[in-house]
Each structure stands twice: as structure tokens, then as C-alpha cells.
């Protein structure tokens, strides 16, 4: 696997592949990789001739008092895992490479509406940071296809909308959430959990599953939400949000909506965990 922190190196290699008529998949990450990331790379390798991965802890998507400095950097282990999974090109830029003028002078990409609710309301500016860096990485790598995890459901919708609105010639593929045996969605932030907290963490998925089951049985959204919040609090969580939304617009679910998604974020100790469930009523 070739590794470079330089934009020109990445572009030169991808152009060479495209010149031969070969397809290129891209998996953007922030590193500290787990099996969920590796699954994205393996799926990308099935779809395309070559796989490019980026590791960049993006300062623009972290708010004040968030975990930018504490976010784990594990480049050596990540590189070994990516090589084994089939990645051929790894882009590891510094913030200066991505934002040479600094954040204050950077052009931004902002996706209105869906960026402002749920995680966007809890973390102002977060999705502007995500959209900007992903758009920039797309322009650097010029992939044919890009892969993202469905665990970050709102992020995936933001990126799909950005690609559509800006007419970017990239296919976006979402990959099912990879879970631990307990049902806990794999996340780099699971490393913040103590052993006791990790034992309690599967309650988040259980609460979401119970909500979906209740809604399918005709129980009101208000009732299933109240019961789920109570169960999370009893398990030691501090809920951030727990919402039932239209699956594609993220508007609050109406009684006539069939395609729904439950989106949840909750704090457990130092970790902010998110999860979701897409289902039909």
C-alpha cells in the first residue's frame, strides 16, 4: 500500500488508474479503525479495481469542548489493517495540507435543513465541517464510488444531498452497521467506555428496537419514545435525542409516513454514542 500526505501524489496515482480505465473507490476515515471501517474497505474492494482510504482527524467538525485532542491516533495499526483489507493508497494529510489558510479563511460547504437537526442541533457546525472536508477529499481523490457506514445515518444523508446538489459524479454507497456481539454499534468512541459502561451500552440498541416494535404494533410515537428514554436513563445513559423521523427528509414522522428511521444519541460516561434503525411502519 502506498501512503502519502501530499495531494499531488494521490492525484497522480488515481489519474494513472483512471487512464487505464480502472475504477476507484474511496473510504474517508478519521483513523482509529475498527471492524466497521475494515468492512467498508472490503466492500469497496469488491466493487472497484482500486481502493483509496484517507485518515484525517478533521478539526472543522469538532466543536468546543469536544474530543479533538483526545481522539485516538493509531496510524501504524490502521495502516496494517488497511493493507490486509485490500486498500492500495492511503492519504494521511495534516490540517495544514487540507486547510492551508486556516479554518477561519476556508471556503465552506453547508447542506441546509438536514444539517441543522439531531446531531446538527447538538453539535452546531459539525455537518458543515463534515460536508466541507468530504467535498474537498472528493475533489482530491476523484473517486468513482465512495463508501460510508449506515451507523452515521444523518451524515450519510448530508453527503448524499451534497453530492446530488453539487452534481458530483460519485456514487455513494451506505454499508450496514457492524456490531459487537452484544449489539453495540462499533465506534472509535467505544474506547472511552469503562468495562461497566460497555456492559450497559447495548441498552441503546435495545431501546431503539423496542421503539420500532411498538410503532409497528400501533403504539404512539410519544409513548414509545418516553419508555425508551426511561429505559436509557435506568441503564445509566444521559439521552441527547431520541427521535422518529421520515427516513429521507429527517422531518418529524407523520402518522401517514411509512418509511421511518429512529435516530438516537446518548452519553454514557465520557462517550457520546449514536445508533439508528431504518424500518417501514
Swiss-Prot record:
One of its GO terms (cellular component) is cytosol. The keyword Protein biosynthesis does not apply. Gene3D superfamilies: HUPs, Pantoate-beta-alanine ligase, C-terminal domain. GO terms for biological process: pantothenate biosynthetic process. The keyword Repeat does not apply. It is found in: Cytoplasm. CDD domains: PanC (cd00560). ATP binds at residues 30-37, 149-152, 178, 186-189. Its EC number is 6.3.2.1. (R)-pantoate binds at residues 61, 155. Beta-alanine binds at residue 61. It catalyses: (R)-pantoate + beta-alanine + ATP = (R)-pantothenate + AMP + diphosphate + H(+). The active site is at 37 (proton donor). Its main location: cytoplasm. Homodimer. Catalyzes the condensation of pantoate with beta-alanine in an ATP-dependent reaction via a pantoyl-adenylate intermediate. Belongs to the pantothenate synthetase family. This is Pantothenate synthetase. It comes from Shewanella sp. (strain ANA-3). The gene is panC.
